[in-house]
């Protein structure tokens, strides 16, 4: 994979278990984050609306449950999804995210899991994460 490019404005958070979670803040950062990440890292995006690409820097077979929830909360927080409702988040490996020519647009191939999160229940989690960047 490409050598990771570090942008000053790209957001980086730390889950409770110490896993790094990176978040793009705009289309260019989303593209760079996705193409420069290890193919085995995990990628998330809120389904059906504009928002940040979230990459969990973990190559394991499965994401730890709490790290997965942390990344989901960040994906919803950095999207246009209403924070008071249930949100669906797509989860796949970076290798299954195909970059399109239009900035910020991707096509998902391979296995994609759709996860659900209720942001009303995750206020404390979000506060903790926002304090780690």
Regions found by a protein language model. Give the residues of each.
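Duplex nucleic acid-engaging cores and interfaces of nucleic-acid transaction enzymes
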Residues: 5-133
């Amino acid at each position: 994979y490409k050598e990771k490019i570090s942008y000053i404005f790209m957001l980086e958070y730390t889950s409770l278990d110490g896993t790094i979670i990176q978040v793009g803040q705009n289309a260019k950062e989303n593209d760079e984050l996705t193409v420069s990440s290890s193919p085995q890292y995990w990628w998330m995006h809120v389904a059906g609306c504009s928002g940040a690409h979230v990459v969990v820097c973990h190559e394991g077979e499965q994401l730890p449950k709490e790290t997965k929830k942390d990344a989901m909360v960040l994906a919803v927080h950095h999207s246009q999804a209403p924070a008071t409702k249930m949100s669906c988040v797509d989860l796949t490996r970076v290798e299954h995210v195909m970059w399109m020519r239009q900035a910020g647009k991707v096509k998902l191939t391979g296995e994609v899991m759709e996860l659900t999160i209720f942001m009303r229940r995750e206020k404390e989690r979000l506060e903790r994460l926002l304090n780690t960047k």
